[in-house]
Amino acid sequence: MEIIYLRDEFIKLGQALKAAGFVESGVEAKEVVQEAKVLVNGEVDTRRGRKLYEGDVVSFENQTIEIKKL
């Protein structure tokens, strides 16, 4: 499980996927999100710009990101 620590109030889904190293680019993030391959808190979300807050959990290809505050 990867942990991303927030410096601000939120991080966008596409940015979180890139920060965790799950995708290499914003274009790739957009594709996997639009193809419904990403779960946020156990539900499919196709919005690359979805705001993630402390406590949110993102899953992609058997990998997980947990969002925490610094």
What would you call each of these model-derived segments?
Residues M1-I11:
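A detector for short, charged/polar N-terminal pre-domain segments
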Residues E2, V57-L70:
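A positively charged, amphipathic N-terminal helix/segment that binds anionic biomolecules
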